[in-house]
Curated annotation (Swiss-Prot):
Domain remark in the UniProt entry: The B30.2/SPRY domain is required for the negative regulation of cell proliferation.
Source species: Homo sapiens (Human)
SUPFAM superfamilies for this protein: Concanavalin A-like lectins/glucanases, RING/U-box
Record's function text: Negatively regulates the G2-M phase transition, possibly by promoting cyclin B1/CCNB1 and CDK1 proteasomal degradation and thereby preventing their accumulation during interphase.
Gene: RFPL1
Cellular component aspect of the GO annotation: cytoplasm; nucleus
Effect of S200A: Reduced phosphorylation by PKC, increased cell proliferation, reduced apoptosis and lack of cyclin B1/CCNB1 and CDK1 degradation
Modifications made to the protein after synthesis: Phosphorylated by PKC and CDK1. The antiproliferative effect seems to be positively regulated by PKC phosphorylation and negatively by CDK1 phosphorylation.
Any coiled-coil regions, as ranges: none
Family annotation (CDD domains): SPRY_PRY_RFPL (cd15821), vRING-HC-C4C4_RFPL (cd16621)
Designated name of the protein: Ret finger protein-like 1
Locations listed in the record: Cytoplasm; Nucleus
Amino acid sequence: MKRLSLVTTNRLSPHGNFLPLCTFPLAVDMAALFQEASSCPVCSDYLEKPMSLECGCAVCFKCINSLQKEPHGEDLLCCCCSMVSQKNKIRPSWQLERLASHIKELEPKLKKILQMNPRMRKFQVDMTLDADTANNFLLISDDLRSVRSGCITQNRQDLAERFDVSICILGSPRFTCGRHYWEVDVGTSTEWDLGVCRESVHRKGRIHLTTERGFWTVSLRDGSRLSASTVPLTFLFVDRKLQRVGIFLDMGMQNVSFFDAEGGSHVYTFRSVSAEEPLHLFFAPPSPPNGDKSVLSICPVINPGTTDAPVHPGEAK
């Protein structure tokens, strides 16, 4: 079963059937609370016949036997907080069952309302790839918009900003404030990482894509496993395979959102994105051992229009 990653009220915005950009972070905060309360930490699905543990966490009735047992005993360990619950003190939670049921009923309406706001494209940025940061296994197009992995290392200068082990590259320009939107054509690629990162991230040695290390990325593996770089990973569900990914960065609200740019549906939003230092687009195609030589491309800006907000220093013009 697929679950929404965004929840809001059923009141339509004055901009049509789309959320105003200023309310997007609030809607995402609401979504996190609803998701946490209505989903099972064992099966990651909506709670069915939820059972409340002594610690206050809840799991589906069918998932109770999947919980780890206490060593040398029959009591159960919560998979969220590792607290022990006695079997005879686990009780049904009717309130959570009603909440999960209501969210499931609202899902079709929410999907229709929570599509990508076309106004985001007014903030579309003309971006290119920064060749000085590219790993030497990457092959970059002459216009600096497309990249794929090769099997032969390129003879590039050894620069401090270049990634020497991990197969990735950053984008230009960097961002220090404002709102910015761009799209990446991932085509039929079965593996990629997209998002933003701090300017100060480590470039040498193998990197780990986590928010704690300054990476706010969405990743695809094996053609179908989609995840966000939270700790622990957040696994994502989409109705269709992503072929063009839209990314909206709002430095003022400290969030970055990912969309299916063709279908218009919301994929995931990171909150509390650090704005203390410049951020760069992060871009990683399939690595050479994968055998996938798909090209990932930054889509050109087409009639971006003008923004409602003034352009500030550090913002792309």
